[in-house]
């Protein structure tokens, strides 16, 4: 890849900031795509911050990556993302917020898929675990040349257990400290 053609996408935040920042430092980031991001020129975020308490204001202010310029960030479903964050703070049963999260995540993935389809210079998309299924199924059919990379913050324990035991002998004396 000689031009920056990788998209990092997550409708929340997770550790996607770090991946996007590292790709930008390596000259590979095309765009970081998310829902809620504290852009300097975001009127919606400014308005929302007017009504937040101190703790929530600080949390909202952290939705920005110091290593990324605002031009590096694209937002889809910003209003829905903000409403979801508010709902998650008050819906302790998670019944309604889980349904809204599924809706926002699926809508985000469809919008992102359309964006990738319209930008043929994109060579790879990095997405995260449960936020990938709709996106990947659309892209697999419409733009099969795009590499689809799923980052999973919570790897399968069963797989890790077997992998650990298969490779136990390869690490020598270090294995005794585990």
Language-model-detected regions and their locations in the chain:
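A conserved catalytic-core segment of Leloir-type glycosyltransferases
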Residues: 2, 37-107
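Aromatic-acidic/polar surface patches that form glycan- and anion
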Residues: 9-13, 101-105, 128
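Short, polar loop motifs at secondary-structure junctions
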Residues: 36-38, 130-133
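Short, well-ordered alpha-helical microsegments
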Residues: 15-18, 132-136
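Acceptor-binding helix/loop patch of EC 2.4 sugar-transfer enzymes
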Residues: 48-49, 77-100, 146-178
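Short N-terminal targeting/anchoring amphipathic segment
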Residues: 6-10, 74-75, 113-132, 139-141, ...
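N-terminal low-complexity, Ser/Thr- and acidic-residue-enriched intrinsically disordered segments
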Residues: 5-51
């Amino acid at each position: 890849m000689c031009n920056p053609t990788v998209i990092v996408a997550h409708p929340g935040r997770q550790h996607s900031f770090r991946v996007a920042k590292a790709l930008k430092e390596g000259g590979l980031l095309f765009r970081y795509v998310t829902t809620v991001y504290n852009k300097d020129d975001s009127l919606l975020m400014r308005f929302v911050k007017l009504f937040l308490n101190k703790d929530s204001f600080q949390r909202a202010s952290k939705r920005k990556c110091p290593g990324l310029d605002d031009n590096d960030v694209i937002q889809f479903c910003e209003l829905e993302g903000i409403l979801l964050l508010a709902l998650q703070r008050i819906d302790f049963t998670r019944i309604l917020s889980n349904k809204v999260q599924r809706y926002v995540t699926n809508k985000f993935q469809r919008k992102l898929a359309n964006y990738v389809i319209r930008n043929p210079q994109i060579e790879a998309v990095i997405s995260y675990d449960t936020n990938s299924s709709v996106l990947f199924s659309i892209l697999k059919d419409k733009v099969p040349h795009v590499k689809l990379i799923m980052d999973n913050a919570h790897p399968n324990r069963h797989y890790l257990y077997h992998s650990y035991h298969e490779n136990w002998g390869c690490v020598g004396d270090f294995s005794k400290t585990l």
